């Protein structure tokens, strides 16, 4: 599986990527610290799964998820957040 990880906090992004790489099902993971770069990548490259922070500057994870699904309808989305108030709207 090919994955992307998107988080605007570098420390959290590093931890997320390390956790993803520990999965034997993920063969490749690309990391991005902003939504625009991630979306540009998805428009040019097929991915299987996207791990997204929800609360980011600019577009934000929820809006990015919608745009990823438009570009890659079969992509799975996993939201990663420490904010309880975002958990329900993410579904």
What are these regions (language model features)?
Residues 29-36:
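Conserved Asp/Asn-Gly motif in the active-site loop of CheY-like receiver
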Residues 6-8, 32, 50:
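Conserved sequence signature across two-component system core domains
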Residues 10, 36, 84:
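Short, glycine/serine-rich, charged loops/turns that create anion-binding
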Residues 18-23, 41:
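Alpha-helical interaction/dimerization surfaces of two-component signaling modules
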Residues 1-11, 16, 20:
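Conserved acidic segment of CheY-like receiver
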Residues 39-91:
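CheY-like receiver
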């Amino acid at each position: 599986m090919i994955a992307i990880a998107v988080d605007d906090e570098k420390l959290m992004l590093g931890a997320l990527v390390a956790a993803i790489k520990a999965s034997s099902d993920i063969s490749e993971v690309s990391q991005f610290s902003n939504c625009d770069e991630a979306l540009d990548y998805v428009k040019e490259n097929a991915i299987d799964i996207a791990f997204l922070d929800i609360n980011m500057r600019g577009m934000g994870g929820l809006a990015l998820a919608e745009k990823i699904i438009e570009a890659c309808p079969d992509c799975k989305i996993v939201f990663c957040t420490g904010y309880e108030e975002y958990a329900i709207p993410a579904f």
